[in-house]
Amino acid sequence: GAVGTTLATISAIKPALNAEELDSWVAIQADGSVVAYYGKVDLGQGLDVAIGQIVAEELDVSYRKVKIVMGNSATSLNQGGASSALGIQGGAKPLRNASAEARRILLNLASEKLNVPVANLSIFDGVISVKGNDAQKVSYAELIGGKYFNSKVEWNKRIGNPLDVKGVAKPKSQSEYKVVGLSLPRNDVAWKVYGTEGNIADVRVPGMLHARVIRTPVAGGLAEKVDESSIKHIKGARVVREKNFLAVVAEREWDAVKAAKELKVTWVANSKPF
């Protein structure tokens, strides 16, 4: 549907991944929980918690009902890097706007189903009810659970960090916040403390070697002569050279470290370093 479409657009088929598709940003599961697709990865800032709070806030669901899918190129758009403040300062905007738009559509769907104006509806934890009559209600799961909005949002035609989208709905003001600003426990603390989760340094593959790059001591310097015999005493260590790229590899990381320190290289200045 077009930007701003509210009714009769629900589909059982998910639209293709596209920044203009609301379904590329947020989904309501069959059980009423929420999945948000975040096109960045966490670099230790706890972005999954922060983004989860923002999505929960705009959709009026509890934080525990939100799952953040991060950096999966099959399901998430390219939002660029997440270093420093980029994860939230820019990266949260599309999800905030998309979640607000999803909430608007859900309210309109509930209005049609309950035959009550949107102004007379309220939301609590994913359940929309008539103000003053909590018995007259409908949940997100009943409205759209497991299906798709099939609705458009306005995309600024940028990719990476500048990417942004917006719908008709206006996100909440700070005075309305109930979830954003809460101090919630981070999901990564326990596995960092107890070492239960794998890190890149723990990866092992068959035939794997460890390497160290040998760098010139001066800008643009060239390796004129490399004495490979200087590291023969280090088990399994050998030189890798491709034009002016120089490195050492070994089966054990410490052996690669030692080889990098002990490899004798004669460097010469480059008349045109850059």
Predicted features by range, described:
Residues A2-F274:
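Cofactor-binding beta-sheet edge motifs in enzyme active sites
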